[in-house]
Amino acid sequence: MTAAPLLPDIEIDLAAPAADVRAFFERDRLLAAYALADLDPENVDRSRWWVARQDGDIVAAALLVEVLPFRPCFAMGETAALAELFRSGTSEARLIVATPPNGRLAIEASYRFERIDQMHRMVVRAGSFRPRVSHTVTRLGPDELDDLIDLYGNASRSYFTPARLEREIYFGVYAGRQIVAAAGTHVRSRAAGIAAVGNVLTRLAYRGRGLATSVTSAVTELALEEHGDVVLNVRQDNAPAVSVYTRLGYEIHAPFVEGPAIRRAVWERLTKNLFGRTS
C-alpha cells in the first residue's frame, strides 16, 4: 500500500482482498455487474484490481480484465479518489474504460479518451419481464461456433470460443442454414445473482423484422431463470434499441460513459494536474 503524494489522506491499495472489492461494488451492483462477475471464484484469476482507501475504507475501485486484448476496465467511487486511482494505481498504456459520469473528468487527468459513448445501464427482473419471441429461436452452443463467427465477423474468433459458448447463454435465428440474428450474455455471476446481455446483432438484410427483439427476449428469459437481475448496455442516443428493451420490461438504471482511453504523457498529466486543462 502506498500513500498518494498529492492527496495524503487517500491511500492506493494494490492488494485489497477480492471480498472487500466485491463488497464495494455491491453498493451499486447493477452498474458494477461486469466487475462482480469478474470477481467470481472461477474468473478472479483473469483480473486485477486496485482501490483507493480513506481512513481504511474503500472509496473508489477499478477492475481490469487482463485476459481480454482490448483491456476492459470498470471504475467507480468518489471523484478525487478516482483521479488518484488512475494517476498512481495503474500505468496501462490503453484501456476501454467504463465509469459513472462523475468519473470521466477524474480519469481524464491521466487518460485521454479517444471516443466517449454516453450509455444507459438497463435492468429487468422476473416480475417486470415481458417476453416477446415472434420467431423460431435456437439455443447456440459450441457446435454453432462457426455460425456465430460468420455473423459477427472473423475478428470475433478470439472472443468466441467453445468454452464461452458452453458457459454463456446465446440464442440465434436462422434463415435456412445461415444465422441472421443472435444475442447472448457477456458475463454471468451466480455468486452475485446477475447476468449481462449483449452482442445483439442482426444481418443488415434482415433488420426491421423484430429479430433482435426475439433473440434478446430468449436470452433474457433463460438468464432470469438463474439470476435475479439481468442488465444490458445501450447508447443513450439509440432510441429504437431503448424502445425494444423497454417493451421487454427493461428499465433504465443509471447512465455511464465508456470508451477507449490512452495514458497521457508525463508532461501532459502534470499540465492537467496543475491547470486542469482538458482535451
Regions found by a protein language model. Give the residues of each.
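Acyl-donor-binding surface of acyltransferase catalytic domains
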Residues: 2-3, 46-48, 58, 63-133
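Short amphipathic alpha-helix that is part of the acyltransferase structural core
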Residues: 2-34, 120-121, 125-158, 273-279
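Conserved donor-binding loop and adjoining core beta-sheet/short helix segment
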Residues: 6-12, 23-88, 183-198
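Conserved acetyl-CoA-binding loop-helix of GNAT-fold acetyltransferases
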Residues: 78-89, 202, 208-224, 242-247
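Conserved beta-strand-loop-alpha-helix junction that forms the acyl-donor binding cleft
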Residues: 98-103, 231-242, 258-271
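Conserved active-site tyrosine of GNAT-family acetyltransferases
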Residues: 107-108, 245, 250
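Conserved catalytic-core motifs of GNAT/GCN5-like acyltransferases
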Residues: 114-125, 251-269
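Flexible, substrate/cofactor-facing loop regions flanked by secondary structure
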Residues: 128-195
